[in-house]
């Protein structure tokens, strides 16, 4: 009797098994879990020493299966808990390095928690749940091992619950499943934070606040540049390289002049500065002093030169246009003591510095991209009247420290600062060289931080209000089919509302009735339903989250190929015009396709699902 019950239960599960082409998350989870178990069983019974290449392939396949399974679980969590406040907070990800955040991160974390040996983030990970340690991270391993065990244990329980629920009803989530999903979400978030923090350096709260202050400063500088016509809105929209170069330069001017107590507060402790500008503290102080003695006209000329990127700019008829040399900057002063000579060095376009000798004394200065002490020394050689004679590294450090103390205790006289330069053009050229030297080094020394700050101001996140109510299931239905299941990204990003399958019984374009053979196909661009003949084209839609080619209807295909067709000239204020244009386009497309079908039927070569020539117009 017991054997009969077991056989009946097994047969019941086979009967209730979800369809392969079902697009519900629970149905997708069932087959993804089956694929993961198959790969795991094959890997357990495989001797990796006999065929290491095959073993490596199986490990990669296992990682992909784990990653896909976690993406499906994440899709379930977003569907069951649509409000972000109900899910685990993941704001800590802003502290992670940019190269860490990718789509395969969840799978790598799971694999790293229970696999034997795995290279992730350039390190070798050992089995945490089995008691091994991460190489060179023994203390961190002991701290996160309980989290890894709790995560893997709960994940096994969750997989059993989800698989059982998928056999019962793939469209319903029981209260027990919901509680388990929520608990897993919090466990995985906690493990992710501690695991990544142990492997790679992450930003502290103060460092992240400093980065946000820099982003605000860059944003203010960009806004001011647009108001003063230094940059155009078209350049910003197109992410012109000129914008990428000019914004850091203008931000230095804004931070030192207009926001002295902000992100570039050089009067405070240098340790409070962002890591991006900390090594340039002494040079920033001298740039600030020179900027303060400029009049409004000279300041505009400096900012214009920083935007154009031209080292030789014609500022006026009486300005010096020829290349400046060290001899042009020799200025002898008289007084009680020895005369002081200002030595200036011209900075080449590629950032290298040339050394010159004068009055029998030589002083070699390394490139501006060198160490901090050399950078400070180079700054004083340009902007300070004190002459440096020692060329050794120890002497440079000692002299720089003394000069730092001298400048802080005795603020420079504006009249003396201006008297060191022959003309206004000389002063502007010196400022241009120093500001560009600091800003351009950010791209070399801190490329990741600079890229993230520029991304914040050039590609801000749009806040879209979302209702807290869960959308009904028909609106979340997607097209059936294994080929689409493999092509769509997970979690899928749907930017348009799809027409439910139950609301459409015929093709939107040709009005052909859908049957068992003629299937429904959603256009990824407009969300309407078409037959295969009227949606035989594919295009990538990155603005909707589809980086790879996905199915689009013939109408949207031609619109994407030729967006300047006559229908785009319709007035946006009248919806009737667009509706009439769409209906006429659908009618004309249907007539042409029906004529083609009629001709093929006469030749005896018609097929219900044969693709035809693409005929489309704009929506």
From Swiss-Prot:
PROSITE patterns: ZF_FYVE (PS50178). GO terms for cellular component: early endosome membrane. A zinc finger (FYVE-type) spans 501-561. GO terms for molecular function: zinc ion binding. Zn(2+) 1 binds at residues 507, 510, 531, 534. Gene3D superfamilies: Zinc/RING finger domain, C3HC4 (zinc finger). It comes from the Eukaryota. Residues 598-619 are annotated as: Disordered. Residues 603-619 have a biased composition (Polar residues). Zn(2+) 2 binds at residues 523, 526, 553, 556. The keyword Zinc-finger applies. Keywords: Metal-binding, Zinc, Zinc-finger. Belongs to the lst-2 family. Negative regulator of epidermal growth factor receptor (EGFR) signaling. This is Lateral signaling target protein 2 homolog. The lineage of its organism: Eukaryota, Metazoa, Ecdysozoa, Nematoda, Chromadorea.
């Amino acid at each position: 009797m017991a054997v009969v019950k077991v056989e009946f239960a097994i047969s019941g599960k086979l009967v209730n098994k979800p369809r392969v082409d079902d697009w519900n998350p629970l149905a997708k989870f069932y087959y993804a879990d089956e694929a993961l178990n198959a790969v795991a069983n094959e890997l357990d019974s495989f001797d990796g020493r006999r065929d290491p290449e095959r073993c490596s392939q199986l490990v990669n396949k296992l990682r992909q299966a784990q990653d896909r399974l976690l993406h499906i679980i994440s899709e379930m969590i977003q569907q069951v808990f649509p409000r972000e406040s109900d899910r685990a907070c993941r704001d800590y990800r802003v502290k992670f390095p940019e190269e860490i955040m990718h789509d395969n991160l969840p799978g790598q974390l799971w694999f790293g928690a229970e696999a034997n040996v795995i290279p992730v983030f350039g390190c070798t990970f050992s089995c945490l749940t089995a008691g091994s340690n991460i190489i060179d991270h023994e203390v961190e391993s002991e701290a996160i091992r309980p989290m890894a065990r709790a995560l893997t244990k709960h994940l096994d329980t969750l997989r059993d619950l989800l698989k059982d629920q998928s056999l019962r009803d793939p469209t319903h989530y029981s209260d027990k499943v919901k509680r388990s999903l929520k608990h897993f979400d919090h466990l995985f978030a906690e493990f992710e934070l501690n695991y990544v923090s142990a492997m790679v350096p992450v930003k502290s709260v103060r460092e992240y606040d400093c980065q946000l202050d820099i982003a605000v400063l860059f944003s203010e500088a960009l806004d001011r540049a647009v108001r003063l016509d230094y940059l155009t809105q078209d350049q910003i929209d197109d992410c012109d390289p000129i914008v990428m170069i000019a914004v850091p330069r203008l931000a230095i001017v804004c931070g030192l002049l207009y926001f002295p107590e902000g992100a570039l507060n050089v009067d405070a402790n240098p340790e409070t500065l962002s890591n991006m500008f900390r090594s340039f503290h002494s040079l920033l102080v001298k740039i600030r002093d020179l900027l303060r003695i400029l009049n409004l006209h000279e300041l505009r000329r400096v900012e214009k030169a920083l935007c154009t990127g031209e080292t030789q700019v014609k500022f006026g008829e009486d300005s010096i246009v020829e290349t400046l040399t060290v001899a042009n900057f020799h200025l002898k002063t008289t007084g009680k003591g020895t005369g002081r000579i200002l030595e200036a060095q011209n900075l080449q376009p590629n950032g290298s510095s040339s050394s010159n000798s004068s009055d029998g004394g030589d002083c070699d200065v390394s490139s501006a991209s060198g160490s901090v002490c050399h950078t400070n020394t180079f700054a004083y050689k340009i902007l300070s009247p004190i002459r440096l004679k020692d060329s050794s590294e120890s002497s440079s450090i000692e002299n720089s420290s003394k000069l730092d103390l001298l400048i802080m205790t005795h603020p420079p006289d504006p009249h003396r600062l201006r008297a060191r330069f022959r003309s206004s053009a000389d002063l502007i050229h010196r400022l241009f060289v120093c500001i560009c030297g600091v800003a351009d080094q950010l791209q070399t020394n801190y490329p990741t931080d600079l890229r993230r700050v520029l991304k914040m101001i050039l590609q801000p996140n749009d806040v879209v209000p979302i209702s807290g109510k869960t959308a009904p299931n028909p609106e979340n239905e997607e097209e059936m089919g294994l080929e689409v299941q493999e092509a769509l990204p997970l979690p899928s990003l749907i930017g348009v509302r799809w027409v439910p399958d139950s609301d459409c019984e015929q093709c939107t374009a040709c009005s052909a009735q859908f049957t068992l053979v003629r299937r429904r196909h959603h256009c990824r661009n407009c969300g309407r339903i078409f037959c295969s003949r009227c949606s035989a084209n594919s295009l990538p839609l990155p603005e909707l989250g589809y980086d790879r080619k996905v199915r689009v209807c013939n109408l949207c295909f031609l619109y994407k190929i030729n967006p300047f067709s006559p229908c785009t000239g319709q007035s946006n204020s009248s919806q009737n015009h667009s509706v009439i244009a769409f209906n006429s386009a659908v009618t004309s497309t249907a007539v042409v396709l029906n004529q083609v079908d009629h001709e093929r039927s006469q030749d005896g070569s018609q097929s219900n699902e044969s693709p035809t020539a693409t005929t489309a117009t704009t929506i």
